[in-house]
Amino acid sequence: MDPSFSHIQMVAIDCDETLLRSDNTVSEYTKDVLHRLQEKGIRITLATGRMYQTAKPVGVSLNLGNVPMILFSGGLIQELETAHKVFERTVPRAAVQRILQLAREYDWHIQSYIDDRLLCHHRNWQSDLYEAQTGAKAEFLGDSLYELSQEPNKLIAIDRIENIDRITASLTPLVGDEVTLVRSQKDFLEIIARHVSKGDALEQLARQYGIGMEHIVSFGNAENDISMLSKTGYAVAVDNAVEHAKLVSREVCGHHNDDGVARWIEEHLL
């Protein structure tokens, strides 16, 4: 173990393109490293844009026990085994209605997440892509999607990068003061409640454990990881991370397909 990291009490790890390989699996080596980290008394939390339905299999495969998971990029903290909700903040209904009205007008692909259900208008290449990448099972509601009364945990727009740029430009003046717009991938635009982020959720979780943010190492790759990377005592971006994530991190570790996170942990924390 690197003595300069002897104060670390917790690690927060993003899932997609950080912990998970491109085939959505984790190596036995990574599983062993995380198990040894827990045995040493260092807490682990997964911090992801995913919903519980698709984050749980990741945690179960790692055999982490009943760890808290930061879901929906900070909109929900939920325990892995018990499904107990520690914290939840939904997207305001008024903003959702305006977003869905625009989506209907311009035929955007918008997904809604309510009660651990993934709700779409109809099946298309975007829903197929999301299901294949995360293992989620979508429900297709047709125009009923635009009439939902319950506030969602998150909305997400999926499209080609140039179209996501246009969607972002359209939504920012419309609801930018009421929601947070953040990309989890270049072609995924997440829409979550204002003042919700992985970093804010991690701060809340750390307070619950009596752990200062200076005692946490975070790992990430994408725009929705930046709030977390910028708030923890030490931040590590994977080699495949977007440039902004690398800029706010103290260090860049290996590629997500090469056990980059686990190799850094073994070298510095074990």
PLM features: what roles do these ranges have?
Residues 41-45, 65-67, 154, 214-215, ...:
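Short active-site oxyanion
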Residues 7-23:
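Asp-based phosphoryl-transfer active-site loop
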Residues 102, 106-219, 223, 227-228, ...:
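Conserved acidic, metal-coordinating active-site core of Asp-based
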Residues 2-10, 27, 190-270:
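Mg2+-dependent phosphoryl-transfer enzymes with acidic/Ser/Thr/Gly-rich catalytic loops
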Residues 25-127:
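Active-site phosphate-binding/coordination module
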Residues 52-55, 96, 164, 199, ...:
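A general structural signal for well-ordered alpha-helical segments in protein cores
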Residues 62-65, 73, 174-177, 231-232, ...:
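Short, structured coil segments at secondary-structure junctions
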Residues 30, 55-59, 167, 171, ...:
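Hydrophobic packing residues within well-ordered alpha-helices of enzyme cores
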